[in-house]
């Protein structure tokens, strides 16, 4: 679950910026889906965890594999994500070239977005 300070605001951003589908929403907790991956958002509410914005750092990163990482990242940056930290580029790997880059969303979460080459290599 990604900690966010305002779940409705975060749901709106993820839908607009990343094309997320809202699966369910209880106000302070919601389930979303992006590119076939389900994830949850929630407001910490002083129950032992906190959002990266309040902590001043993040302890996790979200990784997404998709057909067009350039477009995915560009859409997020256009909607307000910080795309300056991990510019998209080709990486040489044991299975060939893997295109990947990243951004930090407005809620402080690090996202790495790459093409599907690792999935094709490890699941075929």
Predicted regions and their residues:
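Adenine-nucleotide cofactor-binding loop residues
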Residues: 107
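Vicinal oxygen chelate
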Residues: 1, 11-104, 113-124
